[in-house]
């Protein structure tokens, strides 16, 4: 089983959304895929027409971040996850090293996320 935790997923439109959907569909060729994504307008219609197992997380942004992290941790701890994929360092930062050590974890870095000065608060959060 594979896990995908993303802040960017259809029906929202964009390059990262297309990448995460394509990755998820490609992973289906190798086993079941569980996706944790943020709830957006028209997501229910998309999810019903998709062959992917998508769990949407709603609520205020600050609470949603912790709720999704807790759901991902619980899922990894209670399932045999072959690999987990995260679309952004913010999707992985609250998971915890102990949980991440239970599976192969991949975090996609995009945009301007890797050029923070060494020792800065953003640099420490990314690492």
Question: Where do the PLM segments sit?
Answer:
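Structural alpha-helical scaffold elements that stabilize or flank donor/cofactor-binding regions
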Residues: 77, 125-127
């Amino acid at each position: 089983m594979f896990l995908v935790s993303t802040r960017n997923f259809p029906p929202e439109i964009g390059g990262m959304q297309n990448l995460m959907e394509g990755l998820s569909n490609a992973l289906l060729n190798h086993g079941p895929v569980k996706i944790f994504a943020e709830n957006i307008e028209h997501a229910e219609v998309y999810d019903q027409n998709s062959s992917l197992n998508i769990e949407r997380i709603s609520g205020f942004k600050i609470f949603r971040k912790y709720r999704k992290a807790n759901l991902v941790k619980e899922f990894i701890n209670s399932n045999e996850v072959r690999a987990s994929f995260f679309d952004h360092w913010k999707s992985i930062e609250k998971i915890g090293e102990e949980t991440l050590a239970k599976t192969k974890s991949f975090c996609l870095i995009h945009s301007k996320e890797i050029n923070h000065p060494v020792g800065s608060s953003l640099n420490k959060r990314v690492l």
